Amino acid sequence: MDSNTVSSFQVDCFLWHVRKRFADQEMGDAPFLDRLRRDQKSLGGRGSTLGLDIETATRAGKQIVERILEEESDEALKMTIASAPASRYLTDMTLEEMSRDWFMLMPKQKVAGSLCIRMDQAIMDKNITLKANFSIIFDRLETLILLRAFTEEGAIVGEISPLPSLPGHTDEDVKNAIGVLIGGLEWNDNTVRVSETLQRFAWRSSNEDRRPPLPTKQKRKMARTIESEV
């Protein structure tokens, strides 16, 4: 096993522990708590994949961080902060909408890279809006936290989420996954729209329905792909 992979996991475990202690003091805001919850799942998946105990890794990560801090000067820290590009966290959904459990009458699921696409194929003739919580950098989508499809009544009928065991995805991965979700939902004559926030940072152009252009043949091809691969 690569030593960098192990040490990276150890540092991530310790930093999560620090953030958890911070949250336990009721000092974290909604985006902070959301990332904390999702990173916990990610660490669990990585730990299982690597065969490493999280508690042991956390202690080792603490030693690594302490050693770095001992060698770090205040001036070097200022330079690092100044040179690092800043990302922003954008939210379409409330914490309740993100954490709400939902159920599917006719479940369909597809894994696309490091993203999992789920939808209820029993939903028909509905007006559906896609909402997402995500971070951006340089005015482009950086990391998808969670995307969900909502009916006008507020029911959740679809979802795109990162796989905890496979971290890392690009904005193109997200756009492709959204295309698959839209194609699957529209197969049952649903009308799908993308939220203005997601539209702005995921695509540079849109049609009058506030959603990315998607040819009919492409929609049908992606919908068939879901049915054939599940």
Swiss-Prot record:
Belongs to the influenza A viruses NS1 family. It comes from Influenza A virus (strain A/Chicken/Brescia/1902 H7N7). Upon interferon induction, ISGylated via host HERC5; this results in the impairment of NS1 interaction with RNA targets due to its inability to form homodimers and to interact with host EIF2AK2/PKR. Homodimer. Interacts with host TRIM25 (via coiled coil); this interaction specifically inhibits TRIM25 multimerization and TRIM25-mediated RIGI CARD ubiquitination. Interacts with human EIF2AK2/PKR, CPSF4, IVNS1ABP and PABPN1. Residues 1-73 are annotated as: RNA-binding and homodimerization. One of its GO terms (biological process) is symbiont-mediated suppression of host cytoplasmic pattern recognition receptor signaling pathway via inhibition of RIG-I activity. A motif (Nuclear export signal) lies at residues 137-146. HAMAP family: INFV_NS1. SUPFAM superfamilies: Ns1 effector domain-like (SSF143021), S15/NS1 RNA-binding domain (SSF47060). Residues 223-230 are annotated as: PABPN1-binding. Its main location: host cell. Residues 205-230 are annotated as: Disordered. It comes from the Viruses. The keyword RNA-binding applies. Inhibits post-transcriptional processing of cellular pre-mRNA, by binding and inhibiting two cellular proteins that are required for the 3'-end processing of cellular pre-mRNAs: the 30 kDa cleavage and polyadenylation specificity factor/CPSF4 and the poly(A)-binding protein 2/PABPN1. In turn, unprocessed 3' end pre-mRNAs accumulate in the host nucleus and are no longer exported to the cytoplasm. Cellular protein synthesis is thereby shut off very early after virus infection. Pfam families: Flu_NS1. Keywords: Eukaryotic host gene expression shutoff by virus, Host cytoplasm, Host gene expression shutoff by virus, Host mRNA suppression by virus, Host nucleus, Host-virus interaction, Inhibition of host innate immune response by virus, Inhibition of host interferon signaling pathway by virus, Inhibition of host PKR by virus, Inhibition of host pre-mRNA processing by virus, Inhibition of host RIG-I by virus, Inhibition of host RLR pathway by virus, Interferon antiviral system evasion, RNA-binding, Ubl conjugation, Viral immunoevasion. A motif (Nuclear localization signal) lies at residues 34-38. This is Non-structural protein 1. It is found in: Host nucleus; Host cytoplasm. Residues 180-215 are annotated as: CPSF4-binding. GO terms for molecular function: protein serine/threonine kinase inhibitor activity; RNA binding.
